[in-house]
Amino acid sequence: MSNGSVPVSGIGGRGDGEGSSQVHMESTGGMDRAKVFAVYGKGGIGKSTTSSNLAVAFSQLGKRVLQIGCDPKHDSTFTLTKRLVPTVIDSLEEVDFHMEELRPEDYVYEGYNGVLCVEAGGPPAGTGCGGYVVGQTVKLLKQHHLLEETDVVIFDVLGDVVCGGFAAPLQHADQALIVTANDFDSIFAMNRIAGAIQAKAKNYKVRLGGVIANRSERTDQIDRINERIGLRTLAHVPNYDVVRRSRLHKSTLFELEEQSEELERVRDEYLSLAAALWNGVDPLSPSPLKDREVFDLLGFD
């Protein structure tokens, strides 16, 4: 099937792992088969672009991949599916929020190269709690064993919010990845995200995997903060125009028909990143700085 909802085997109702602060789940068992990554970063930094291209890179390596968009804008997976797919909240509304009536094919869609796509969605702007929807989505995915029946799960998480339901992916992830650019605002957010992830790591298995430098020709400021707090850059995607064009084509970089040195380089970067993450990168335990320390550290002499 292409770009449509897909049936997934193994529907069942079993205990859940702990989700958001609003959702009680009982067990995190049964997810050992999949490598689970949570992607965070400053709003607008390119997390969805990064997540979708990384998902395809994993699929190019022969892995079964599930990408979960955790933003009310529900635009994480459109380059994979070529459309804004119905969200989990849309599907729940159709069954009057009786979660037990949903089937995987009601909210799971197949995208490019077989990547499975889910969009959590959220309430209308200014109402409700988007984080709660993320927590409920995690619960639903576990009930239907979707976090077990894949090789790789990628959570693409809203902005730099690491609280409540938006922290639910961290409670199920093996590693968190932070997308940043070589600028003050992105790095400032990165430092705060690293602190939040470290706090979660005290009670959950999640560890920081590293940093993905995005939309940046240079990485000197990223390198400076990495050295200071104990992070590392796993991949570097320069600010190539081919990335912008791929979004306008509603396409991942791997589907573009054009040929260019820039395109080949960025494809290779994602494939190398996927291979490194699959083979395993050493977990990090950074020591984030206080906000004023970041302010004093960054910039030019």
Swiss-Prot record:
This is Light-independent protochlorophyllide reductase iron-sulfur ATP-binding protein. Keywords: 4Fe-4S, ATP-binding, Bacteriochlorophyll biosynthesis, Chlorophyll biosynthesis, Iron, Iron-sulfur, Magnesium, Metal-binding, Nucleotide-binding, Oxidoreductase, Photosynthesis. Belongs to the NifH/BchL/ChlL family. GO terms for molecular function: 4 iron, 4 sulfur cluster binding; ATP binding; metal ion binding; oxidoreductase activity, acting on iron-sulfur proteins as donors; oxidoreductase activity, acting on the CH-CH group of donors, iron-sulfur protein as acceptor. Residues 1-26 are annotated as: Disordered. It comes from Halorhodospira halophila (strain DSM 244 / SL1). It catalyses: chlorophyllide a + oxidized 2[4Fe-4S]-[ferredoxin] + 2 ADP + 2 phosphate = protochlorophyllide a + reduced 2[4Fe-4S]-[ferredoxin] + 2 ATP + 2 H2O. Pathway: Porphyrin-containing compound metabolism; bacteriochlorophyll biosynthesis (light-independent). Binds 1 [4Fe-4S] cluster per dimer. CDD domains: Bchl-like (cd02032). Its EC number is 1.3.7.7.
